[in-house]
């Protein structure tokens, strides 16, 4: 089983090399990884293109033939050393999705957000967190079981050049179990221009009507002296007199 897991690291290196050159990665490789169909080195060799390996070997032979006689011995000795180091190297093992010990920095915001004139001791602690890689690009190593653990730290304040020690409690999050979960990415909502226009047409628009209000002035009243006079002719005579 360990040998099977060790096959994935060279395959990942190959995928990175292909993506760096600009060629699209075949979907069959991801399907085989997700179906756990790679069980031996023969299955891995079927996925890798042997033409690229042959081209690398031909290029190496061409460079060796073009070199001078003195450089030929040096390049051949380097090639032998590289082959010997490859033979002595141990097979790579995939980093499984599981809990590992990580270092967590205790920031001052976790203790007091209103004050920054203090120190925290210890400044960092160890926590258990999920890490590792999964077989498919659409899944990610995440925590399936979490436990909250309170710890006690020291809050050191400096007052009048003297340290004052206080106790504070910080809650840490430890991962107890991990598993590879599918990554859910929200799909962007695309709206056609015709749909937005139709919605605007259906939406009733509020119309603002401005009305002009005329203020009527009260009628001019007669002079108190001539209120009893109703005849216009007599009124003119009186005013004319």
UniProtKB/Swiss-Prot annotation:
Location relative to the cell: Secreted
An example Gene Ontology biological process: positive regulation of glomerular mesangial cell proliferation
A single Gene Ontology CC term: platelet-derived growth factor complex
Keyword Transferase in annotation: no
Phenotype caused by lack of the gene: Perinatal lethality, due to severe hemorrhages shortly before birth. Kidney glomerular tufts do not form, apparently because of absence of mesangial cells. The heart and some large arteries are dilated in late-stage embryos. Mice lack microvascular pericytes, which normally form part of the capillary wall, and develop numerous capillary microaneurysms, leading to hemorrhages. Mice display erythroblastosis, macrocytic anemia, and thrombocytopenia.
Chain spans, region Disordered: 217-241
Leader sequence residues: 1-20
GO molecular function, one term: collagen binding
Compositionally skewed regions (Basic residues) per UniProt: 217-230
CDD domains to which the protein is assigned, alphabetical: PDGF
Tissue: Localized to vascular smooth muscle cells. Also weakly expressed by cortical interstitial cells but absent in tubules. Up-regulated in areas of renal fibrosis. In mice with unilateral ureteral obstruction, an increased expression in interstitial cells and in some tubules observed after day 4.
Positions annotated as propeptide: 21-81, 191-241
UniProt keyword Plastid present: no
Glycosylation sites: 63
S-S bonds: 97-141, 130-178, 134-180
Site, as annotated: Involved in receptor binding: 108, 111
InterPro entries reported for this sequence: Cystine-knot_cytokine, PD_growth_factor_CS, PDGF/VEGF_dom, PDGF_N
Keywords tagged on the record: Cleavage on pair of basic residues, Developmental protein, Disulfide bond, Glycoprotein, Growth factor, Mitogen, Proto-oncogene, Secreted, Signal
Protein's job: Growth factor that plays an essential role in the regulation of embryonic development, cell proliferation, cell migration, survival and chemotaxis. Potent mitogen for cells of mesenchymal origin. Required for normal proliferation and recruitment of pericytes and vascular smooth muscle cells in the central nervous system, skin, lung, heart and placenta. Required for normal blood vessel development, and for normal development of kidney glomeruli. Plays an important role in wound healing. Signaling is modulated by the formation of heterodimers with PDGFA.
Family per similarity comment: Belongs to the PDGF/VEGF growth factor family.
Subunit note: Antiparallel homodimer; disulfide-linked. Antiparallel heterodimer with PDGFA; disulfide-linked. The PDGFB homodimer interacts with PDGFRA and PDGFRB homodimers, and with heterodimers formed by PDGFRA and PDGFRB. The heterodimer composed of PDGFA and PDGFB interacts with PDGFRB homodimers, and with heterodimers formed by PDGFRA and PDGFRB. Interacts with XLKD1. Interacts with LRP1. Interacts with SORL1 (via the N-terminal ectodomain). Interacts with CD82; this interaction inhibits PDGFB-mediated signaling pathway.
Protein name (database record): Platelet-derived growth factor subunit B
